Amino acid sequence: MSTDNKRLLIDIGSTYFKVSSKDSLEQHFRDFNKRILDDLTHKCGDTLKRFTPEDIQICSSANGGLSTLIIGVTHSYSLKYATNIAYNSGINIIDSIVFQDIEDYSIPSDLIDVVIIVGGINSNGGLFDERLDSYLGKLNYSNLVYVGNAPDAKTLSSRLDKLVVLPNVVDDRLHIVEEHLKDYLTNLYQEDIEGKEDIKHLYEITANQIFPTPYVVGQSLPIMHSAFSVTDPFILLDIGGATTDVHYSKDLVNDNIVTEQGHDRIVFKKLGVYKSRQSLIFTAENNEFAYELLMHLKVTENIYNEHSEKATKVLMQLAIFLVLCKMSSYRPSYITLKLLSINSIVFTGGISKVLNVEDIEDIVAFFYRKILNSDHKPVTVLDSNYDIWTLGAKEHASCQ
């Protein structure tokens, strides 16, 4: 096994790529007129030559991540467990469907990378009738996996083509079983990367598996205190060009799931300032407090039409506000966090190159005053040198 001194860590993002070695950390804007490998070689060729393929570890979010639709029996167990596993595997969830109401749900128009079917403990069967077959027949999807009760596994296997059957994510004591679905989704991400023409060429320089960036960042959370002055419970906001990832202490949710990890993840897929710029603006325009925030920042809605450093800064500040709204009782999404219990908020990703601590604290204070009617002030920690990613990448690589 290589030591950290002999290892090169690379992260390929939607907008930037980063290269970290013992001696330095490089960050470069991607040139979208070139293949990723060609761009990487052009800008970091001398560094790459110093390492063997066995000593180069790569993670990536440049393929946009995998999308999943989850069909389950109840929100209490099956849907909740499958959603938790998917998010913590670096998968983007587009919707969760309660099977008994499946006829009330619209059909997504986009291609879905994987559909997950889940529900029931192994002593119960007969939970999925022909309505499931009818709904799936209208979907455009690439993979279908079943992680529900054992009796229905046999029935559905005979009815649904190319169904992958894995052990139930709900055991007989209603506890979560993570391993099998998590491994499946991680491997599916790997296959997706290998199928992406622009990313699979990266295997010319590495002999190691390429993992999802959010998964790698998640490896840093248990050891975050070794590099940062962070007090539990905390949240980590990774705000970039295409998405915003949030990693949070489980103490911040009421309905906690007992798993091996002390932190969970949620992703807001279309909340970024470059590739997801228009989606971010649309979300802001539909938030009744965004206009007031713009006034607080002494700008108007005309800033949405500008392409300047100032506009990028304002959009980053809006992203902070909007994602906090989405995790609050004001605009609840998948989870509602106990934001008044947070002691630290850690920021990483592209945001660290645009905003300083004062810029961030201004928005956090505005959110707490306006939305939560509170003077609560969590400590802001800004990862200005991507040390969190480096920490997670080293931890992940040491386990390989």
Predicted region positions:
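Conserved helix-loop functional segments at active or binding sites
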Residues: 222-227, 252, 326-329
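Short glycine-rich, Thr/Ser-proximal phosphate-binding strand/loop in the N-terminal lobe
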Residues: 14-39, 80, 88-95, 257-279
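Adenine-nucleotide phosphate-binding core of ATP-dependent small-molecule kinases
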Residues: 206-213, 301-332
